[in-house]
Amino acid sequence: MVRVAINGFGRIGRLVMRIALSRPNVEVVALNDPFITNDYAAYMFKYDSTHGRYAGEVSHDDKHIIVDGKKIATYQERDPANLPWGSSNVDIAIDSTGVFKELDTAQKHIDAGAKKVVITAPSSTAPMFVMGVNEEKYTSDLKIVSNASCTTNCLAPLAKVINDAFGIEEGLMTTVHSLTATQKTVDGPSHKDWRGGRTASGNIIPSSTGAAKAVGKVLPELQGKLTGMAFRVPTVDVSVVDLTVKLNKETTYDEIKKVVKAAAEGKLKGVLGYTEDAVVSSDFLGDSHSSIFDASAGIQLSPKFVKLVSWYDNEYGYSTRVVDLVEHVAKA
């Protein structure tokens, strides 16, 4: 049984808790969010506009939220170093604030007494692991790790399968990405990203993403071979990766489908999905895969040049992998 604490009770923090509570080998012992009172934390956990109402019982008292009779201690500390992770016997702190995502800042959880930290955001200093891609490289001496981003979790398994079978010479990725909490409901100030300050619900907004370059960190053989961008679109959840690649080996689209399907039914089962149905984004709400290859959406121009399409629930699929990584780290 791994004892976890969650820091940051936003979109990812709340879904991570839902998923963790369903795992027999994971015990959620505490959560911290300096901006949320216990009654509000219980309310937000119970009601979710995207993923629906929590099926069990949720209540609270002065020091806990109570889920299905289980008491989870709550704290409102701004500085993670002040949290009682040592006295709470926290094995792994899950940091889903998006703030403490580098080795020096995530170290605060270790200083507070947690044995290890899993960051639910890409990191430029902490080692990144993508389940199904490079988690076997994790060693128990690593105290702080990152689960990378939702888009990297979608792209990396597909890129690995394609690169292993055909070789990727180079590629460009576009993610058509649902809106997130960083965006604005109406035009507002956004000094570092002017486009990002425009109304989220009424625009298609070009944006940057480091997801494709990050694939090179989890798959060194693809370092420098992929880059990408994003379009933020007015859907609440589920995104889609468009990966256009030049291959080293000539192949057919049917052969690509066979290879991806075999991986989805084999070594990447549960991480990579496969469909030939005429699907749209809402069909993947609540899908726990990192990446679902859409076989009927891709196209091929020539034997070495293809466009591949893969869906992901950028909230639920990613949060599922966070808990998978927590369990993997705990076992190592």
Swiss-Prot record:
<keyword id="KW-0324">Glycolysis</keyword>
<feature type="active site" description="Nucleophile">
    <location>
        <position position="150"/>
    </location>
</feature>
<feature type="modified residue" description="Phosphoserine">
    <location>
        <position position="302"/>
    </location>
</feature>
<dbReference type="InterPro" id="IPR020829">
    <property type="entry name" value="GlycerAld_3-P_DH_cat"/>
</dbReference>
<dbReference type="GO" id="GO:0020037">
    <property type="term" value="F:heme binding"/>
</dbReference>
<feature type="binding site">
    <location>
        <position position="314"/>
    </location>
    <ligand>
        <name>NAD(+)</name>
    </ligand>
</feature>
<dbReference type="GO" id="GO:0050661">
    <property type="term" value="F:NADP binding"/>
</dbReference>
<keyword id="KW-1017">Isopeptide bond</keyword>
<dbReference type="GO" id="GO:0006915">
    <property type="term" value="P:apoptotic process"/>
</dbReference>
<keyword id="KW-0520">NAD</keyword>
<dbReference type="GO" id="GO:0015886">
    <property type="term" value="P:heme transport"/>
</dbReference>
<feature type="site" description="Activates thiol group during catalysis">
    <location>
        <position position="177"/>
    </location>
</feature>
<dbReference type="GO" id="GO:0003729">
    <property type="term" value="F:mRNA binding"/>
</dbReference>
<feature type="binding site">
    <location>
        <position position="232"/>
    </location>
    <ligand>
        <name>D-glyceraldehyde 3-phosphate</name>
    </ligand>
</feature>
<feature type="cross-link" description="Glycyl lysine isopeptide (Lys-Gly) (interchain with G-Cter in ubiquitin)">
    <location>
        <position position="63"/>
    </location>
</feature>
<comment type="similarity">
    <text>Belongs to the glyceraldehyde-3-phosphate dehydrogenase family.</text>
</comment>
<feature type="binding site">
    <location>
        <position position="180"/>
    </location>
    <ligand>
        <name>D-glyceraldehyde 3-phosphate</name>
    </ligand>
</feature>
<protein>
    <recommendedName>
        <fullName>Glyceraldehyde-3-phosphate dehydrogenase 3</fullName>
        <ecNumber>1.2.1.12</ecNumber>
    </recommendedName>
</protein>
<dbReference type="InterPro" id="IPR020830">
    <property type="entry name" value="GlycerAld_3-P_DH_AS"/>
</dbReference>
<dbReference type="Pfam" id="PF00044">
    <property type="entry name" value="Gp_dh_N"/>
</dbReference>
<keyword id="KW-0560">Oxidoreductase</keyword>
<dbReference type="GO" id="GO:0005886">
    <property type="term" value="C:plasma membrane"/>
</dbReference>
<dbReference type="GO" id="GO:0005739">
    <property type="term" value="C:mitochondrion"/>
</dbReference>
<keyword id="KW-0597">Phosphoprotein</keyword>
<feature type="cross-link" description="Glycyl lysine isopeptide (Lys-Gly) (interchain with G-Cter in URM1)">
    <location>
        <position position="307"/>
    </location>
</feature>
<dbReference type="GO" id="GO:0051287">
    <property type="term" value="F:NAD binding"/>
</dbReference>
<dbReference type="GO" id="GO:0005829">
    <property type="term" value="C:cytosol"/>
</dbReference>
<dbReference type="GO" id="GO:0003723">
    <property type="term" value="F:RNA binding"/>
</dbReference>
<dbReference type="GO" id="GO:0006096">
    <property type="term" value="P:glycolytic process"/>
</dbReference>
<dbReference type="Pfam" id="PF02800">
    <property type="entry name" value="Gp_dh_C"/>
</dbReference>
<keyword id="KW-0496">Mitochondrion</keyword>
<feature type="cross-link" description="Glycyl lysine isopeptide (Lys-Gly) (interchain with G-Cter in ubiquitin)">
    <location>
        <position position="46"/>
    </location>
</feature>
<dbReference type="GO" id="GO:0005634">
    <property type="term" value="C:nucleus"/>
</dbReference>
<feature type="cross-link" description="Glycyl lysine isopeptide (Lys-Gly) (interchain with G-Cter in URM1)">
    <location>
        <position position="160"/>
    </location>
</feature>
<feature type="modified residue" description="Cysteine persulfide">
    <location>
        <position position="154"/>
    </location>
</feature>
<feature type="binding site">
    <location>
        <position position="33"/>
    </location>
    <ligand>
        <name>NAD(+)</name>
    </ligand>
</feature>
<feature type="binding site">
    <location>
        <position position="12"/>
    </location>
    <ligand>
        <name>NAD(+)</name>
    </ligand>
</feature>
<dbReference type="GO" id="GO:0009277">
    <property type="term" value="C:fungal-type cell wall"/>
</dbReference>
<comment type="function">
    <text>As a side activity, catalyzes the hydration of the nicotinamide ring of NADH or NADPH at the C6 position to give the corresponding hydrates, NADHX and NADPHX, which exist as R and S epimers, that cannot act as electron donors or acceptors and inhibit several dehydrogenases, making them toxic.</text>
</comment>
<dbReference type="GO" id="GO:0004365">
    <property type="term" value="F:glyceraldehyde-3-phosphate dehydrogenase (NAD+) (phosphorylating) activity"/>
</dbReference>
<dbReference type="GO" id="GO:0005811">
    <property type="term" value="C:lipid droplet"/>
</dbReference>
<feature type="binding site">
    <location>
        <position position="11"/>
    </location>
    <ligand>
        <name>NAD(+)</name>
    </ligand>
</feature>
